[in-house]
């Protein structure tokens, strides 16, 4: 077998680190709300180099709040992570892969968890729009010092 030097991304694990669903006033929020609620979504990416060679944990921390007339209807917090092994990838490319490609791989799972959680909470399933991580990182780097961090906080409010 010949050793290859081709770039490779391997997903070693995916998991929920934290999941919380709050429905502070279910009687009123499920039966007495007549207006469409305002949905606010915040997303944070955390990247941690693990002790194993070329292994990284990429974590998406998502908070979704629904309010109507300044009253909280529900709040969801999901922290979902993946362990990725990057092989034969330059340091410059690693930053892009870890802050864009890896979040793109795990985001659909976060979206599904949010949808299922709202539905199990008695609401219609909330489908978060697709997120263009490359555009967000590009915008963050043009407004901030790109050397500072690859851990920006994003406002990706749903436009429903």
UniProtKB/Swiss-Prot annotation:
Organism in which the protein naturally occurs: Orientia tsutsugamushi (strain Boryong) (Rickettsia tsutsugamushi)
GO molecular function, one term: unfolded protein binding
One GO cellular component term: cytoplasm
Subunit composition and interactions: Homotetramer, a dimer of dimers. One homotetramer interacts with 1 SecA dimer.
Cysteine disulfide partners in this protein: none
Recorded family membership: Belongs to the SecB family.
Pfam families in UniProt: SecB
Main location: cytoplasm
Protein name as annotated: Protein-export protein SecB
Record keywords: Chaperone, Cytoplasm, Protein transport, Translocation, Transport
Function: One of the proteins required for the normal export of preproteins out of the cell cytoplasm. It is a molecular chaperone that binds to a subset of precursor proteins, maintaining them in a translocation-competent state. It also specifically binds to its receptor SecA.
Biological process terms in GO annotation: protein folding; protein tetramerization; protein transport
Location in or out of the cell: Cytoplasm
